[in-house]
Amino acid sequence: MSKTHLTEQKFSDFALHPQVIEALESKGFHNCTPIQALALPLALSGRDVAGQAQTGTGKTLAFLASTFHYLLSHPANAERQTNQPRALIMAPTRELAVQIHSDAEALSHLTGLKLGLAYGGDGYDKQLKVLENGVDILIGTTGRLIDYAKQNHINLGAIQVVVLDEADRMYDLGFIKDIRWLFRRMPPAAQRLNMLFSATLSYRVRELAFEQMNNAEYVEVEPEQKTGHRIKEELFYPSNEEKMRLLQTLLEEEWPDRCIIFANTKHRCEDIWGHLAADGHRVGLLTGDVAQKKRLRILEEFTQGNLDILVATDVAARGLHIPSVTHVFNYDLPDDCEDYVHRIGRTGRAGQSGFSISLACEEYALNLPAIETYIGHSIPVSKYNSDALMNDLPAPKRLTRPPRSNNGPRRHNNAPRRSGAPRNNRKRAD
């Protein structure tokens, strides 16, 4: 299989439904990524698929194309009721469910198959109104799906296709009981097409997932390299006292067009946001405490380029495709080595290159050996000059204070910068 982003395999080479091919090509999708080239032939032949591939390699399009093709090629149950969707796509987070729904809209418009969305925290009545009119494909999180099912707003007895996206994350977050509850209300596995996809699939997860699948075929792309080969990784060892100053110095040096900074707790994220906002950066905060409408608005502003920096917990690390992220900063090394892969997978997507910079501080440096064992290589270490770190930083903002706008004009590249370590002052450790 080619190591490049796209293969020579075209969607039109497959026996995909003509409307699916037309919808894909209308959005500029002609050639398959490796995971699409592997998964589509299996799904089109009616085989269940468990696909593992790095983030940003086209998993979502693989299962959406398969789902739409299957529904267009197989008639619905003649006794199907209005509250019975034909396909169910389950995601671990609200943001991912919304994104999948957005990606599916082009296929929906051209094929006429109707979409529904179900996620917690917001829009209960609005989502329900769509479901009451009947949907073909329902995309959602398990909690809201169960809520609607228990109230008979939806009935899963006519499901023909089921998808688990970011399946390992769903199990890790404790959704296994919810998933099994939903599966028990569907037709048997042999009577439906089953697919699951994720960047990481442990043996435990595959074993649990295969309970609900029909002799699934396991496919993977580049299993020997868990981090994308287009991502340049770099590691620093700061003291706790110098950690924030190093981050801000690196931001001045790198001047990223669009970056995500990950930390392990919401309080740490709030602290980072406060320092960067006070320093004039256009920065957004994404944690579990941020209201759902605001979270979606922040993601939209970041995607559209109105924000340059997103500070986030791992709520934003899984499955979200935000184009043109040039840098990922691990302010804290994650406790879960799989989260490292998902975090840095926000950059270097869709054939682009990216940079991942991690800070192994005194508190989280002990997480490094497990991460390096998991990814199969050591992260290159760079040194920095403590005396050259930025030291004229303003006091951080606090969320309890009325925030100044983060949407002001970005500083131009020729704007004066504070004194900081020049690029050639950063040296790779031997």
Curated annotation (Swiss-Prot):
A motif (Q motif) lies at residues 9-37. PROSITE patterns: DEAD_ATP_HELICASE, HELICASE_ATP_BIND_1, HELICASE_CTER, Q_MOTIF. Its main location: cytoplasm. This is ATP-dependent RNA helicase RhlB. DEAD-box RNA helicase involved in RNA degradation. Has RNA-dependent ATPase activity and unwinds double-stranded RNA. A motif (DEAD box) lies at residues 165-168. It catalyses: ATP + H2O = ADP + phosphate + H(+).
